[in-house]
Amino acid sequence: MCDRNGGRRLRQWLIEQIDSSMYPGLIWENEEKSMFRIPWKHAGKQDYNQEVDASIFKAWAVFKGKFKEGDKAEPATWKTRLRCALNKSPDFEEVTDRSQLDISEPYKVYRIVPEEEQKCKLGVATAGCVNEVTEMECGRSEIDELIKEPSVDDYMGMIKRSPSPPEACRSQLLPDWWAQQPSTGVPLVTGYTTYDAHHSAFSQMVISFYYGGKLVGQATTTCPEGCRLSLSQPGLPGTKLYGPEGLELVRFPPADAIPSERQRQVTRKLFGHLERGVLLHSSRQGVFVKRLCQGRVFCSGNAVVCKGRPNKLERDEVVQVFDTSQFFRELQQFYNSQGRLPDGRVVLCFGEEFPDMAPLRSKLILVQIEQLYVRQLAEEAGKSCGAGSVMQAPEEPPPDQVFRMFPDICASHQRSFFRENQQITV
């Protein structure tokens, strides 16, 4: 049975906020209370005050569970969410001839559409359910604002007023590993051949792409310097390189395989903000990521400080998202029956907050990253556990032992991975 209460949540909530007189500029436009004003000041204005001008948008984000105190403030995103909901809800209609956007205290005017009028427009017999709008149903401009960072003007207007994330949740600042790389062909470490033999197990990554929760492609990286996840073709004339020349390019699979036309459209829209991509590097210490693209990127991994809440990667910052030593410690505890099998995966979510309460199938683009060696250890641990045997795993395997174990593990678990439209067997 259709639940019509879901579509009334915004209407009821907004009327309550107007009547509360708690939000400056949010007032009734007429005595009949059929129209209302909502403040609409641009975040780039010199006199923009986040606490005042974004208060109603923040309140909606809190109500929807998209923001809680201590999270990083994102006024532009809050505003886009409410605008999207207003524009798509049958309960509201913008009255453009009453809106004033060119004055010092700009505002928009919306009319509350009576239910009888809605029925006349839709037809009682074919009205169907009026459910609360989702972000996937936003128009092009709304989607564009939801998935990318605010413009430079917006950002500069709000940066002084946006509280930083709590100190406890801030990642440690790390040196830019990629910026320190020498030219192609120069050894990264003295005696590089030996180094490569011992550490290739940790430098190789298995990268899996999920669109709408479905696996659409996989790749394994082989370059010790790391890789760049991007959409652009390598080596095209006039193409600007982002990162060292020696980086391996792993391309996002095309959106053609997505069955839903609407999802394909939105995914391709998101692609437009991922041109510069992200850089990935894997080593004995763990997995590191540097976001270069304009589109927002969120992540999860065992090295993320704050678990169970959205973790946004700041642009041009190097962040450790996976700690290999921590994985080994937890794996040892698992073998000693002192803990669960540790998760060796890192997940990047492009354009949408993650992790959150939304199911993974609702996410447009998820990229899962695993160190190949860690992946094989986890598989072996799962098998040994299922067989009832206990395999002793050293907390920190010596390099020579790693090098001996690695070929054997890989030989027994051959599989094909997708990269650059080729099948690659490891």
From Swiss-Prot:
Q: Say where the protein is mainly found.
A: nucleus
Cell compartments where the protein resides: Nucleus; Cytoplasm
Q: What biological-process GO terms show up in the record?
A: autophagy; cellular response to lipopolysaccharide; cellular response to type II interferon; defense response to bacterium; defense response to protozoan; dendritic cell differentiation; follicular B cell differentiation; germinal center B cell differentiation
Q: Give the consequence of mutating residue 197 to T.
A: In a breast cancer sample; somatic mutation
Fill in the PTM field for this protein. Ubiquitinated. Ubiquitination by TRIM21 in macrophages, a process that is strongly increased upon interferon gamma stimulation, leds to the enhanced transcriptional activity of target cytokine genes. Ubiquitination leads to its degradation by the proteasome. Sumoylated with SUMO3. Desumoylated by SENP1.
Q: Which SUPFAM superfamilies match?
A: SMAD/FHA domain, Winged helix' DNA-binding domain
* UniProt induction comment: By IFNG/IFN-gamma. Negatively regulated by microRNA-155 (miR155).
State a GO cellular component annotated for this protein: cytoplasm
Query: Which GO molecular function terms does the record list?
Result: DNA-binding transcription factor activity, RNA polymerase II-specific; DNA-binding transcription repressor activity, RNA polymerase II-specific; RNA polymerase II cis-regulatory region sequence-specific DNA binding; sequence-specific double-stranded DNA binding
Which tissues express it? Predominantly expressed in lymphoid tissues.
Keyword line? Activator, Autophagy, Cytoplasm, Disease variant, DNA-binding, Nucleus, Repressor, Transcription, Transcription regulation, Ubl conjugation
Q: Which residues bind DNA?
A: 7-114
Question: What disease does the record describe for this protein?
Answer: Immunodeficiency 32A: An immunologic disorder characterized by abnormal peripheral blood myeloid phenotype with a marked loss of CD11C-positive/CD1C dendritic cells, resulting in selective susceptibility to mycobacterial infections. Immunodeficiency 32B: An autosomal recessive primary immunodeficiency characterized by monocyte and dendritic cell deficiency, myeloproliferation, and susceptibility to severe opportunistic infections, including disseminated BCG infection and oral candidiasis.
Q: Please give the family membership noted in the entry.
A: Belongs to the IRF family.
Stated role:
Transcription factor that specifically binds to the upstream regulatory region of type I interferon (IFN) and IFN-inducible MHC class I genes (the interferon consensus sequence (ICS)). Can both act as a transcriptional activator or repressor. Plays a negative regulatory role in cells of the immune system.
Know the name of this protein? Answer: Interferon regulatory factor 8
Q: What species does this protein belong to?
A: Homo sapiens (Human)
Taxon lineage = Eukaryota, Metazoa, Chordata, Craniata, Vertebrata
